Structures are given as C-alpha cells and as structure tokens.
C-alpha cells in the first residue's frame, strides 16, 4: 500500500464520493475522521483514524473487516477503524470533540 502524503480534505472528499456505497453495502449510519489527519499532525506512516456507527444488527467482525479493507483500498492507506460505541471512556471526549463527520 502506498504511503501518500494526503490531507483531511482529500480523505473527506473520497469518503463523501463513496458515502452511499459505504452506507448501503456495509450498513453504516455515521462515518467520520479523527486523529492526526484532523489535527494536521500526520506523518508519512500515519494511519487514518475512522469512526463509524453501524446499523443495528450489522456490528459484527465480518462486516467490520470488509469495511476496513474497503476503506484502506479507497484511501490507499492503513485505516484504524473505530466503532463509536466501543470507544474507551478515557478517549471518548477527545475523539468526539475532534471528529469530522462525512456530510
């Protein structure tokens, strides 16, 4: 996988263009970006932190891994996929304060 220097606007644009497919195929209600790319602190080896909320009944390992693979291919970068309701309490406030949701 190529490690390209990309920015938050490029990531958001790619996710917005693919948003309908992500929601329909992977049963996602919300998707957003947080972490180093949002803060402008990404390095050449940084992964992209993505926060998701799955539709009820679709939060399973198989769907999670399919979405992770799809996002890594779409964004041409490693993705750290985080399920919103699984965020540890000590990280929740920071993540929710910095997340940029797609549409």
PLM-predicted stretches and their roles:
Residues 51-53:
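Short hydrophobic/aromatic beta-strand micro-patches
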Residues 1-30, 38-44, 55-103:
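Catalytic core of pol beta-like nucleotidyltransferases
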Residues 33:
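Conserved histidines in hydrophobic membrane contexts and catalytic metal-binding motifs
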């Amino acid at each position: 996988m190529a490690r390209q220097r990309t920015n938050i606007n490029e990531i958001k644009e790619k996710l917005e263009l693919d948003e309908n497919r992500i929601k329909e195929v992977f049963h996602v209600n919300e998707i957003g970006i947080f972490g180093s790319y949002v803060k402008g602190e990404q390095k050449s080896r940084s992964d992209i932190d993505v926060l998701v909320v799955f539709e009820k009944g679709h939060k399973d390992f198989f769907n999670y891994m399919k979405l992770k693979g799809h996002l890594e291919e779409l964004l041409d970068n490693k993705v750290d996929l985080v399920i919103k309701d699984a965020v540890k309490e000590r990280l929740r406030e920071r993540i929710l304060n910095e997340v940029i949701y797609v549409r």
